[in-house]
Amino acid sequence: MPAANPVLIQDLPRSRNEPPPLFLIHDASGLLTSYFKLGTLGRRVYGLWDPKFDADGIGGWQSIRDIAEAYIRPIKRVMLRGEIVLGGWSFGGVLSVQIAHMLATSGRGLRVSRIILIDSVYPRCPRPEAQKEPAKLHHAPALPGVNQETRDKLMTALMRATCLSDQWDPPAWSSSRTGVLGTARLHGVPPTPPHAVLIRARDMVPMADPEEKCPLDRTRFLPQLGWEDMQEGFVEQVIETTGNHYSVFDQDHIDTITAHIRKSLDLNLD
């Protein structure tokens, strides 16, 4: 694991008009490997990895709120006040939503102006056709070249993320984007949501049994992967990218996903 958390993934010379830094939150693996493959994003990019990757079982994390609260501290070591962008692949997008809400309600000078969900499935979709079967080992991604010890840790991390996502109590946002995004106007009133962009994979994860569906594709029939059921209008823009959930960061697709993340950062949504 890196010594620092967050890790500086891409640097940018300091300037008066530099764009808000992007903090990418780890996926369900707890690692940042995929984000280091990205091409230049035109701003300072940090990555947060799971400091409890080596822990067994639930690993000390009791909830997504628990993780989000812990991750706010290292973010504030880098950026105490001002505006940031949060994003993440899969589980990292879910964590980004929770972190953004906690920062919005704390009112302590740091706010999230935009969230980028990279094929993040809304885990609490209530629709009957979106209900998933219990996770099975063959639903996990192939891990070629990974030794057994690391493979076991990755599988533990994946199951931990699945368990916590299934128990997540999604935060409440106001229904309109008025005033300063990512802030709460009054104590006890739901905060104004940041801008949110969803990058969704075009393809389904291939399964050996054609009758089976990967759990991460259970909301693929919905334009916003289920986020429309958390709150209508929360996701403002959807961008389709090549590949399936597990392959969007593969070499064949890395230039495309880089371009889509840059577009998500630069879109004028005001």
What positions do the PLM features span?
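A hydrolase-biased, glycine/serine/histidine/acidic-enriched motif that marks catalytic-domain neighborhoods
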Residues: 1-270
